[in-house]
Amino acid sequence: MAYPFQLGLQDATSPIMEELTNFHDHTLMIVFLISSLVLYIISLMLTTKLTHTNTMDAQEVETIWTILPAVILILIALPSLRILYMMDEINNPALTVKTMGHQWYWSYEYTDYEDLCFDSYMIPTNDLKPGELRLLEVDNRVVLPMELPIRMLVSSEDVLHSWAVPSLGLKTDAIPGRLNQATVTSNRPGLFYGQCSEICGSNHSFMPIVLEMVPLKHFENWSASMI
C-alpha cells in the first residue's frame, strides 16, 4: 500500500507489476538522458559562441534528429508492447472471479463455486478497529490463492468504474454491458489495497478494494466455510 510522502511506486507483488516497474525505470532513464542533453546544449548556446545565426541548412543535423528520435521511440515501444501482451494473456486460469461495480460498492462472484458471492462495502470511519486503515477497509475481503493465475471479469451495473490494485499492477475499467478481463497473480501472501479509479459520483472515494492473498489450502478452507 502507499505511505505518506511516498515518492516511488508501491512494492511489486505480481510479475506484471515487476515488469511495469522495470519499464518505468527504463523509460525514466531515457527521459533523464534526453533532458540532460537538451540542458547541456542550451547552456552551451548561452555561455559560448557556438551559435550560427546565418546557417539556414544543415543536412547532417536534420538526419540525426530524424533518426535518433525514431530509435528512442523503438526502444520505448518494444518493451511496452511486450508488457501489454503479457497483461492480456492468460492461460488456464485456476479461478475466475466476476467483479461488478455499483454506486458505491463492489460485488464479487466466484464463478467456479455455487452460491459463493458477496458485496463489499467500505467500513465507516467510526466503526474502524485500532490498526485498520481509513477509507481502505471493507466488510468482506476478496480472498484469493497466491501463486496461481486468476482471471478477473470486471463490469458495472450502473456507471463507469475502474477496479485498480496498484501493487499488483491492475487497473481495469468497469463498463456497463461489457466484460473486461484482467489477470491476478501474487508472488506472496498479504493484504493488498486498491480503490475505484474512475470518478463515478459523490461517493467515488468510498469504494475501496481489499485482496487477501493466502496459500491454496487456506483458500480452500475459506471457500468451504463460505458455501
UniProtKB/Swiss-Prot annotation:
Subcellular location: Mitochondrion inner membrane
Cofactor(s), by name: Cu cation
Species for this entry: Sundamys muelleri (Mueller's giant sunda rat)
Biological function: Component of the cytochrome c oxidase, the last enzyme in the mitochondrial electron transport chain which drives oxidative phosphorylation. The respiratory chain contains 3 multisubunit complexes succinate dehydrogenase (complex II, CII), ubiquinol-cytochrome c oxidoreductase (cytochrome b-c1 complex, complex III, CIII) and cytochrome c oxidase (complex IV, CIV), that cooperate to transfer electrons derived from NADH and succinate to molecular oxygen, creating an electrochemical gradient over the inner membrane that drives transmembrane transport and the ATP synthase.
Listed name of the protein: Cytochrome c oxidase subunit 2
Taxonomic lineage from the root: Eukaryota, Metazoa, Chordata, Craniata, Vertebrata
InterPro entries reported for this sequence: CcO_II, CcO_II-like_C, CcO_II_C, Copper_CuA, Cupredoxin, Cyt_c_oxidase_su2, Cyt_c_oxidase_su2_TM_dom, Cyt_c_oxidase_su2_TM_sf
UniProt binding sites for Mg(2+): E198
Superkingdom classification of source: Eukaryota
NCBIfam families: CoxB
Keyword DNA-binding among UniProt keywords: no
Keywords, ordered alphabetically: Copper, Electron transport, Magnesium, Membrane, Metal-binding, Mitochondrion, Mitochondrion inner membrane, Respiratory chain, Translocase, Transmembrane, Transmembrane helix, Transport
Side of membrane Mitochondrial matrix, spans: 46-59
Membrane topology annotation: Multi-pass membrane protein
Topology, Mitochondrial intermembrane side: 1-14, 88-227
Catalyzed reactions per annotation: 4 Fe(II)-[cytochrome c] + O2 + 8 H(+)(in) = 4 Fe(III)-[cytochrome c] + 2 H2O + 4 H(+)(out)
Enzyme class: translocase
